[in-house]
Design a protein with these regions (language model features):
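Charged, low-complexity intrinsically disordered terminal segments
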Residues: 1-81, 87, 95-342
Length: 342
């Protein structure tokens, strides 16, 4: 039996991840695009407690990657970098002992705030942060092997941290709010075959496409933004359009204001598109798709590289309870979102 825990950020995901990191007893393998000071200490402390800690971060220093690599190495952990060149190491994968965690956000405070006493809703204080989706799974030897193989392959292609780190483009941090209500994680039991790891941007695209093609009842998507001028994104939008034409309830929720060049295209779609507003809820950074009774939680943005060359990770859960949990979160965000208008 596999235990699956569904969690949302900012509600509880950061608290859940901090608890997991603190309870590790043997090893932590982490492949995360960005790790900042608000989580660096947890990995350093784990290494100092004697755990085998390995971390792969993207090859840019923003949000503390350079300092994280330096301090982890000093604590006896191993750290490498990936994503040199045009493709980014954009995945969010944690393997803590026998628990696999996959999510949409980085290990930085904006993406993963936590309650100071590690309390879960409704006991804790409501938190401000970007909307994120996370999922953990324990008790699946099949998933454990897949995650270990994916991390090992990623580790082998990664390299030692450089003396001089590359600078990432300085992007304005999104405004954030306190979405309400904030809800606790949900723990579900399922079978190992209903939980599947997806590795690589192209593989994530194929998984999304298959879900859109097979959907018979609903397709509820959420992404920070879309780039419909890119072929992989255009294909997904066309699949949602075809699903809508056969009676599937389709809708797409963006995490913020879309690029002006894409607005006219989004408005013309035969299904509804809205954007999140931090003054009403928060900004969205989740990348997920609920299709009937299944859900895919992914690190991949709907962009050319996010759905092709980037190192991305997703977890598909075929369970009505998991789909209902994320669909309810999607619905709460949808109700406070603003329709896209020209």
């Amino acid at each position: 039996m596999t235990l699956v825990t569904c969690a949302l950020g900012p509600d509880s995901a950061g608290t859940l991840l901090t608890r997991l990191l603190g309870r590790g007893r043997q090893s932590i393998d982490a492949a995360i695009y960005e790790v900042g000071p608000s989580y660096r200490w947890a990995l350093v402390r784990a290494a100092e407690r004697g755990l085998d800690v390995r971390l792969v971060v993207d090859a840019h220093r923003s949000d503390g990657n350079a300092a994280t690599a330096r301090e982890l190495s000093a604590a006896g952990a191993e750290c490498r970098i990936a994503g040199v060149g045009t493709a980014a190491a954009h995945g969010k994968l944690l393997i803590i002992d026998s628990t696999v965690a996959v999510g949409t956000g980085n290990l930085i405070w904006r993406d993963a705030p936590r309650d100071r006493h590690l309390r879960l809703p409704p006991a804790g204080t409501p938190l401000a942060g970007t909307r994120e989706w996370w999922v953990t799974a324990t008790g699946s030897s099949r998933l454990d092997r897949a995650a270990a193989d994916a991390f090992s392959a990623h580790w082998r292609t990664a390299t030692a941290p450089p003396d001089a780190w590359a600078s990432a483009p300085r992007l304005a941090a999104p405004a954030i709010g306190v979405p309400m209500p904030q809800v606790p994680p949900r723990v579900l039991c399922t079978t190992s075959r209903r939980v599947g790891l997806v590795v690589g941007g192209a593989a994530v695209r194929e998984a999304l496409a298959a879900m859109a093609t097979a959907a018979r009842r609903r397709l509820l998507g959420t992404v920070p933004y879309v780039r419909p001028e890119s072929a992989p994104v255009r294909d997904l939008i066309e699949r949602m359009t075809r699903a809508s034409s056969r009676g599937v309830a389709c809708a797409l929720l963006l995490g913020g204001v879309p690029d002006p060049s894409n607005v006219e295209h989004l408005v013309s779609l035969p299904f509804a598109v809205r954007r999140m507003d931090p003054s009403r809820s928060t900004s969205g950074h989740a990348k997920g798709l609920v299709a009937d009774g299944a859900v895919l939680i992914s690190s991949a943005n709907w962009s050319a590289m996010g759905l092709s060359g980037n190192w991305e990770v997703a977890l598909r859960v075929e369970h009505a309870g998991a789909a209902a949990y994320y669909a309810a979160a999607w619905r709460r965000d949808w109700e406070t979102a603003i329709p896209i208008e020209v």
